[in-house]
């Protein structure tokens, strides 16, 4: 045990933790905290739905700051809903002074909010006269605009008779309140994230005329919605789903993501490093699985891809190209805690609390703002467009 303590001290001495502050979603669950899946931490109900299908109440949740990461963890509440809402979709602004998140509003509809890290300045970020619209899963843009997922299409997932609403992406400009739909997909978009080059990566579920158990691909596009292209997974049966994709700092192509199934385990799964410049299909562009660098990645074609697989990971955050924060549950009797994981197979606990679950770790530090990609469209223009097939 002395050797293990020493190992832990050495791993936590890593300079990547000099930030000494992490933002998390904190969920007080109670005696079932070791048995719950990510639904209890505010995520979607399954791998084909978005936030409109998630629970809208009954949570004891807050956005918290963890500090003193190498010792006895200190906690500070940044924001706590007073209506029992969860607080998913945490995104820290590049200035590290404010963050956005999703929360159920007074009318029980999902909306995107912002709060300063000192707990002040709570405000709704997207205002629209369309009272039926809900917004969630949003991200800041370098231009000052916002991309959010919304129920704007008023359509549902076919195989559940439309009972789970589909979320497509919208572009919102806080300066003039303009809202424009970016994607017109039959099924869901998830997790828009700004890449290092200013483009947007996201997961798209393709459904029509294919085996939709295996078709949640990583896409990328310009912030104005133009040039939507596959980034990883198109034309492959493995993996079924890639969630929570985030670019590695300073790298032009590599990203980290969680692969999961269709039915079965919800939202969490195996942690993978990808490089589309190596390949864009199946396991061929996967650099390694964390924390199993020497284990061959087999392209398993299976509906419930990660059922019975441990550890389970969700919501990774790259600190460098080798070190990452991640939410993990190590086995079926473990808590959902925050870990430091690296490409050398080390998995080090930073924080967990009995009776609770922690999710979505984000380091409190300023980060470079990606370049602004100018709009390539003129809304309202009547010029004829041409498409080549």
What residues fall within each predicted segment?
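Beta-propeller blade signature
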Residues: 61-67, 113-119, 163-176, 215-226, ...
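Loop/turn-rich, solvent-exposed surfaces of beta-rich toroidal or solenoidal domains
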Residues: 203, 247-339
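Conserved small/polar residues in nucleotide/adenosyl-binding loops
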Residues: 387-389
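Long amphipathic alpha-helical scaffold segments
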Residues: 1-77
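Multi-bladed beta-propeller domains
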Residues: 71-85, 116-134, 172-187, 222-241, ...
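Short, conserved, GDST-rich strand-edge loop motifs in beta-rich repeat architectures
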Residues: 27-58, 104, 109, 148-165, ...
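Residue-level detector of Asp-centered blade-edge/turn motifs that repeat once per structural unit
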Residues: 17-18, 94-95, 141-143, 195-197, ...
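Hydrophobic beta-strand positions that form the internal "hydrophobic ladder"
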Residues: 22, 99, 146-147, 200, ...
């Amino acid at each position: 045990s002395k050797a293990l303590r020493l190992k832990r001290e050495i791993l936590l001495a890593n300079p990547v933790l000099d930030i000494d502050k992490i933002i998390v979603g904190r969920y007080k669950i109670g005696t079932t905290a070791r048995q719950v899946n990510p639904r209890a931490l505010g995520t979607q109900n399954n791998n084909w739905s978005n936030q409109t299908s998630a629970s809208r109440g009954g949570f004891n949740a807050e956005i918290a700051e963890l500090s003193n990461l190498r010792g006895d963890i200190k906690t500070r509440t940044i924001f706590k809903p007073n209506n029992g809402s969860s607080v998913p979709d945490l995104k820290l602004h590049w200035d590290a002074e404010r963050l956005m998140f999703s929360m159920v509003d007074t009318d029980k509809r999902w909306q995107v909010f912002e709060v300063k890290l000192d707990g002040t300045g709570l405000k709704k970020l997207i205002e629209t006269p369309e009272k039926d619209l809900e917004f969630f899963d949003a991200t800041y843009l370098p231009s000052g605009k916002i991309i959010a997922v919304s129920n704007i299409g008023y359509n549902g997932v076919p195989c559940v008779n439309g009972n789970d609403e589909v979320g497509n992406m919208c572009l919102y400009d806080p300066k003039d309140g303009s809202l424009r739909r970016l994607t017109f997909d039959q099924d869901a978009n998830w997790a828009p994230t700004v890449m290092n080059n200013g483009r947007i990566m996201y997961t798209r579920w393709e459904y029509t005329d294919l085996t939709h158990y295996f078709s949640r691909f990583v896409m990328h596009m310009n912030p104005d919605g133009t040039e939507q292209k596959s980034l990883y997974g198109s034309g492959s049966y493995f993996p079924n789903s890639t969630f929570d994709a985030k670019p590695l700092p300073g790298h032009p192509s590599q990203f980290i993501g969680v692969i999961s199934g269709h039915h079965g385990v919800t939202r969490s799964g195996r942690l993978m490093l990808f490089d589309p410049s190596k390949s864009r299909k199946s396991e061929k562009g996967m650099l390694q699985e964390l924390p199993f660098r020497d284990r061959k990645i087999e392209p398993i074609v299976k509906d419930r891809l990660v059922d019975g697989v441990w550890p389970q990971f969700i919501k990774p955050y790259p600190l460098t190209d080798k070190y990452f924060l991640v939410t993990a549950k190590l086995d079926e009797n473990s808590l959902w805690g925050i870990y430091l994981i690296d490409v050398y197979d080390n998995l080090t606990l930073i924080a967990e609390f009995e009776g609770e679950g922690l999710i979505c770790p984000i380091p409190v530090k300023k980060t470079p703002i990606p370049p602004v990609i100018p709009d390539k469209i003129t809304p309202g223009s009547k010029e004829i467009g041409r498409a080549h097939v």
